[in-house]
């Protein structure tokens, strides 16, 4: 996994996306991880599949939580910036630099919100693959 969610910069959306891409590595490699760590029938006694699945589940949950916090923190930060800029625009509606900056921040906010949808798809895919391979070995705690 990459940087903790509080270390992720929200200023540059392209950089933020790149950091998310790196943070999603565990999800991208889940099939490979399961294939290399879960035993086949012939090796079933040599590896504790329950423990392996539990560790993978905990890693996935940590990654999902970290990314979710980073995205939501950046959304909150950008929303605040948009609100401030909107207030300034009301006072100075002819300032083109201000209008341009406001549009830029509004676009960034829209893109950040779309990352929440991407995150949902990535998480659902990982859970599905995890459940297909680990359901017999490990039952994750119920989500509230």
Swiss-Prot record:
The keyword Heme does not apply. Keywords: Coiled coil. One of its GO terms (cellular component) is mitochondrial intermembrane space. Residues 82-120 form a coiled coil. It holds the Pfam family MIX23. It comes from the Eukaryota. Belongs to the MIX23 family. This is Protein MIX23. It comes from Xenopus laevis.
